Amino acid sequence: MAVAAAAAAGPVFWRRLLGLLPGRPGLAALLGRLSDRLGRNRDRQRRRSPWLLLAPLLSPAVPQVTSPPCCLCPEGVHRFQWIRNLVPEFGVSSSHVRVLSSPAESFELMKGQIRVAKRRVVMASLYLGTGPLEQELVDCLESTLEKSLQAKFPSNLKVSILLDFTRGSRGRKNSRTMLLPLPQRFPEQVRVSLFHTPHLRGLLRLLIPERFNETIGLQHIKVYLFDNSVILSGANLSDSYFTNRQDRYVFLQDCAEIADFFTELVDAVGDVSLQLQGDDTVQVVDGMVHPYKGDRTEYCKAANKRVMDVINSARTRQQMLHAQTFHSNSLLTQEDAAAAGDRRPAPDTWIYPLIQMKPFEIQIDEIVTETLLTEAERGAKVYLTTGYFNLTQAYMDLVLGTRAEYQILLASPEVNGFFGAKGVVGAIPAAYVHIERQFYSEVCSLGQQERVQLQEYWRRGWTFHAKGLWLYLAGSSLPCLTLIGSPNFGYRSVHRDLEAQIAIVTENEALQQQLHQEQEQLYLRSGVVSSATFEQPSRQVKLWVKMVTPLIKNFF
């Protein structure tokens, strides 16, 4: 509360605080964005304030330590170091980071990692499909669990799966029925958690049809973890995502600290979710408020505490680890370290987990993304991609109002996941075309066509679901930062769903080249949007769709 009181004291507080940050443009921009947000929200009576996110900056949870020298703040990427004031910073060698290029590669890697897992398998997704490929994945899990029991020295293998309740319960055959044999056969080793948004309750829950109740809010995090290795992606566990639905994937191999963090994060969300039982019923964790039957405010407060405890404790651990590493390096020469057998390569890549759970008043990803867009200077290039082009007003204003060059990749109607669907849902691609045309018109009216360019992805027989961004600093032909994970940069991602992605910051040229090639391969399958694009027959939007889109755009 002291933070909010200090912020309310007025501009003098901010001048003094920003004066303490020479040479920290990122953090200064972050505080500036938050100051603007407080001004907009000050008159709203809200139980919790996003200003609480500033607490780690003003009242650190751990003692202040001397910042390491340039080994942790390399030239050119040091400007992103401010992110660690909000989330844990994980320094790794770029040799442990691999960008995957195709759905098939991701699927085969996932199965291979499950087969050799000894300690833990943690999988968070929107849903698990019901086809033969999804069954193959379940069979892999079952086989690995069986082997763990039959081994000469039985392992402590644990499997934790987190899905969305509404999406995972749709239809008679669904994610729950696919997974049910696992908790039935291995009740001591398997946990299946189903997150239910606290905003779908009461009469609303009774009236909204099954296919549409997902619009209120979802568990949208996609993390696939095997022992100490992690796949971060935007892809769900469904056949199209294993074959012909284009997404992004990064494999973090033997990164124990990152694996520990995401295990704890999934456990935290699992604790505030419903637990699947062997008889296909669900139960609340003992002592937890029910997500849609209990008091919503109390539930959200408990969920906020559970998740923020994970983030803050990991941040504290990493700060202490950085301090110890810095102290040890100052005492030991490289020869001493080699003689002692420490052959670990120095970190040249930094991973920052960015969490967005607005229902729980956690908006770290939003703050970091807005600050990155704010700081992108003249000459910098931002490649931003989303499968569902529906930017929030804040992101749109930053794209149109800052100086960096933007190339925005989005799905053409034919590769939109809803293309050809029956009923009202089939009009969703047209709604996205309408939103795209409105944005393009605004770009043109501002004379920004050279600086902000739209491109549409098209690939015969495929759909498009990739999201994220690549940041190229001014004068550089390779990206030094990428965001990869579940957020789509739209209203849902920011306000309704549970999201997670990572910021990868690297000074390693080989990894930068991997990221650059990933970006190029996606954009090579696209065409530049012009006024002629919207004259095509496939871009004609019916009047009723134009009228309805402003009313429903916040739900997709």
From Swiss-Prot:
Presence of keyword RNA-binding: no
Pathway(s) of this molecule: Phospholipid metabolism; phosphatidylglycerol biosynthesis; phosphatidylglycerol from CDP-diacylglycerol: step 1/2
Chain sites annotated for binding ATP: 124-131
Localization terms from the record: Mitochondrion
InterPro entries for this protein: PGS1 (IPR016270), PLipase_D/transphosphatidylase (IPR001736)
Modified residues annotated as Phosphoserine in this record: 49
Regulation of activity: Activated by calcium and magnesium and inhibited by other bivalent cations.
Transit peptide, start-end: 1-28
Entry's family note: Belongs to the CDP-alcohol phosphatidyltransferase class-II family.
Protein name per the record: CDP-diacylglycerol--glycerol-3-phosphate 3-phosphatidyltransferase, mitochondrial
